[in-house]
Amino acid sequence: MPTVNQLVRQGRTMNKTKTKSPALMSCPQRRGVCTRVYTTTPKKPNSALRKVARVKLTSKVEVTAYIPGVGHNLQEHSIVLVRGGRVKDLPGVRYHIIRGALDASGVENRKQGRSLYGVKRPKAAK
């Protein structure tokens, strides 16, 4: 426990909170170019082939970003919009690609939860 004199001289320091998505540099999203699009396997106990991409952001940082949804049209040199948000069973993946923005198309035939996957409202069937 510090003395009053120590507190007068030094004061108390606040703990700085560390950001979970440093590559975005305090921006909500960043644009980037895909350098590699590939699949990877999740940690135990899950099993799948998760679609991910290495993206070089405009902030000159290269990150691994998850491609959500069923099917995608991304390839090398595709321009994408990246947001924060990790994937729990993929170590090192701390970003998501935004579907329906720039070169990333929306998910085909999606009817529910469309806003997260860049899908317009379907025309009402008569």
Swiss-Prot record:
The keyword Ribonucleoprotein applies. Residues 1-16 have a biased composition (Polar residues). SUPFAM superfamilies: Nucleic acid-binding proteins. Residues 1-24 are annotated as: Disordered. CDD domains: Ribosomal_S12. Pfam families: Ribosom_S12_S23. One of its GO terms (cellular component) is small ribosomal subunit. Keywords: Methylation, Ribonucleoprotein, Ribosomal protein, RNA-binding, rRNA-binding, tRNA-binding. InterPro entries: NA-bd_OB-fold, Ribosomal_uS12, Ribosomal_uS12_bac. The keyword Ligase does not apply. GO terms for biological process: translation. Part of the 30S ribosomal subunit. Contacts proteins S8 and S17. May interact with IF1 in the 30S initiation complex. Belongs to the universal ribosomal protein uS12 family. NCBIfam families: rpsL_bact. With S4 and S5 plays an important role in translational accuracy. Interacts with and stabilizes bases of the 16S rRNA that are involved in tRNA selection in the A site and with the mRNA backbone. Located at the interface of the 30S and 50S subunits, it traverses the body of the 30S subunit contacting proteins on the other side and probably holding the rRNA structure together. The combined cluster of proteins S8, S12 and S17 appears to hold together the shoulder and platform of the 30S subunit. PANTHER family: 30S RIBOSOMAL PROTEIN S12 FAMILY MEMBER. This is Small ribosomal subunit protein uS12. The gene is rpsL.
